[in-house]
A protein has these predicted regions:
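Non-catalytic DNA-recognition/assembly elements of restriction-modification systems
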Residues: 49, 175-247
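Polybasic, glycine- and aromatic-enriched phosphate-binding surface used to engage nucleic acids
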Residues: 1-187
Length: 247
């Protein structure tokens, strides 16, 4: 499966995998979505080279502390923890736990990554049945008010980095919005991500500058829409932006 390995994520960007991860599971959709560990006999038939690769590293893999799975199905190559394996298979927001600004990227390609503790990555997606979408949440999370709240409560690290871990973002306020207001913001965020994609792909400096200007204008529009939902004035926004990076 495609995965992230020490990749820098950018605001309103699309996450791009730079490596591959062996995922020895099959996602089974039923009344409850589960991740079924592929057993050795099946792996030998379907993915013989993968099994050979894992077997060559068996001694190293067996030194890990394995949690999860029944005794009958547990294998030396299963992941150390398995409680979130099914959550990768859906559109989601990916963020670096440690950063010096809001950096929430979008993924709709089922990218894998490691996480937990101080990262390096964390995933967000709307609760099932919630009216908010990933794009709407990205707009709120990137807003200066949200980042000001994070900076006020976060843990700081060397180099000016501070945590955007679960405990610092899970209680951020989400403004009420009508379906039309949410749709408007979602459309702008989709355009903003596309503009950043175009800027990243541009090979001619002039084209890149044009796309970057377009992205900046779209970001201002998104910020303005969310500010209105929060009922914030220009002075309120200036105050939020003035909150310093924690020392």
């Amino acid at each position: 499966r495609p995965c992230l390995l020490d990749v820098t994520l950018y605001p309103y960007s699309r996450a791009e995998a730079n490596a591959w991860m062996i995922f020895p599971y099959e996602i089974v959709n039923g009344a409850r979505t589960t991740a079924r560990l592929i057993q050795p006999a099946e792996m030998a038939q379907r993915f013989p080279l993968c099994l050979a690769y894992l077997t060559a590293r068996r001694a190293e893999l067996e030194r890990r502390n394995i949690v999860g799975g029944s005794a009958a199905t547990r294998q030396f190559y299963q992941f150390g923890r398995s409680q979130s394996l099914t959550k990768f298979n859906s559109p989601k927001i990916i963020l670096p736990i440690l950063s010096r600004e809001a950096r929430y990227a979008y993924d709709d390609n089922n990218i894998m990554m490691t996480g937990g503790g101080n990262g390096p990555y964390y995933l967000i997606r709307p609760r099932e049945g919630a009216p908010e979408t990933n794009f709407f949440l990205m707009a709120v999370l990137h807003h200066p008010l949200s980042e000001a709240i994070v900076r006020t409560h976060t843990s700081s690290f060397r180099g000016g980095y501070y945590s955007h871990g679960k405990q610092f973002i899970e209680h951020l306020p989400i403004p009420s919005a009508t379906p039309a207001e949410r749709a408007d913001i979602e459309a702008l965020v989709a355009q903003l991500i596309a503009a950043n994609d175009a800027a990243q792909a541009a090979r001619v400096p002039h084209q890149r500058i044009l796309h970057e200007r377009h992205a900046a204008a779209l970001r201002d529009q998104v910020e303005g829409r969310v500010s209105r939902l929060f009922g914030l004035s220009a002075a309120d926004i200036a105050l939020a932006k003035a909150v310093p990076i924690p020392a």
